[in-house]
């Protein structure tokens, strides 16, 4: 599941804004080197969040279950991974399980904290099936970083850098 329409490189700042109101100095170089041409934001152009991370994960699972002609109650194991949960507790996996209706006695596990959380979830699901602990495991990895990358969160830092450029002695003050 991808939220909204793809956002091209040229449109990024229409969604996340400008800092101090300047375009990013590193943007062109980073995008040129990483080869990414578009991405999906869970934001509209006004910066309003359109989907939570939990909603995106639950929608992805619902699409999978629809293709498999299954219901959430038929899942034995739900393994979720994210580096960008909306909250620490309850865990991301428990929140996704709840968004799916929380039916059945599915085991729910959450992996969080780094870029490899999706692989951890996949490995856990695979090993659980190999061990016979689960017959129908679903693994989902989701991220929603777009809301954290909005310009408004970087304005204060930009102001401090401007002050430092005007008065370099500030770097040595305690």
Question: Where are the predicted features?
Answer:
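Short glycine-rich or small-residue beta-strand-to-loop segments that form or flank ligand, phosphate
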Residues: 76-84
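Short glycine/serine/threonine-biased micro-segments
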Residues: 33, 79, 139
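Acyl-thioester C-C bond-transforming condensing/cleaving domain
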Residues: 21, 62, 66-72, 86-174
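Conserved "HGTGT" condensation-loop signature of ketosynthase/thiolase-family condensing enzymes
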Residues: 1-76, 98-104, 168-173
